[in-house]
A protein has these predicted regions:
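Glycine-enriched, solvent-exposed interface loops adjoining structured elements
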Residues: 1-205
Length: 205
């Protein structure tokens, strides 16, 4: 038994597992708020290096009881590229998010001017912390995902061990079952109201 190697391969499998979770979609426990003070004449700003994506962004003006957050429209690269004057300054109304290999940036349009103080307020998806060395530390997952973590790790390790290849299918099924349970519970709860739309037609007699 190669104890040292087993520890390293388990750590790598765990890191790959959490990366897979990020690719599967939104994990509520990774949503983090943040703000960036905007500078007049500067259009592009870098987000924290562990940012996966932005899910909400707004332009904040004022402070205290006079603070106002205005929604910023997220636009695509094609929409941003069609702006005829990308250096036009004014009150930002749109944001173009670039998810690069080493960082995530947001480019605002119009470029912030100096007529008032602007703050970029956002909610981002934070990357799940990986395990680098050793076996100490706290797992960056909530308790409701622990069964999924355990079954997923067992499945990932089994794929590397020929002697247990006959159990891979069963372990994958258990992992998918546990993930569906956890992901189904890890959803946002909010009130919603449906109002029927009625149209009346009248005809002359």
């Amino acid at each position: 038994m190669r104890t040292g190697y087993d520890l390293k391969t388990a750590r790598r499998s765990l890191n790959l597992l959490t990366l897979e979770w990020q690719n599967r979609g939104l994990n509520l426990w990774t949503i983090q708020p943040g703000t960036i003070a905007l500078t007049a004449g500067t259009s592009t700003y870098s987000l924290p290096t562990d940012t996966i994506d932005l899910i909400e962004m707004s332009l904040r003006t004022g402070s205290g009881e006079n603070q106002i957050d205005s929604n910023l429209q997220r636009i695509s690269v094609s929409t941003y590229s069609q702006q005829t004057n990308k250096n036009n300054q004014g009150r930002p109304t749109q944001g173009f998010v670039r998810r690069l290999a080493t960082e995530t940036t947001v480019t605002l349009w119009p470029v912030p001017d100096n007529t008032q103080t602007y703050t970029f307020a956002y909610y981002r998806l934070q990357g799940i912390s990986s395990i680098s060395e050793g076996v100490t530390g706290t797992a960056d997952v909530p308790p409701r995902f622990v069964p999924c973590l355990v079954s997923g790790l067992a499945y990932y390790i089994a794929m590397k061990r020929p002697e247990v290849s006959d159990r891979v299918v069963a372990l994958k099924q258990e992992y998918e079952f546990q993930f569906e349970l956890a992901a189904g519970e890890d959803q946002e709860s909010a009130s919603i109201r449906f109002i029927p739309y009625s149209t009346f037609y009248t005809t002359g007699i």
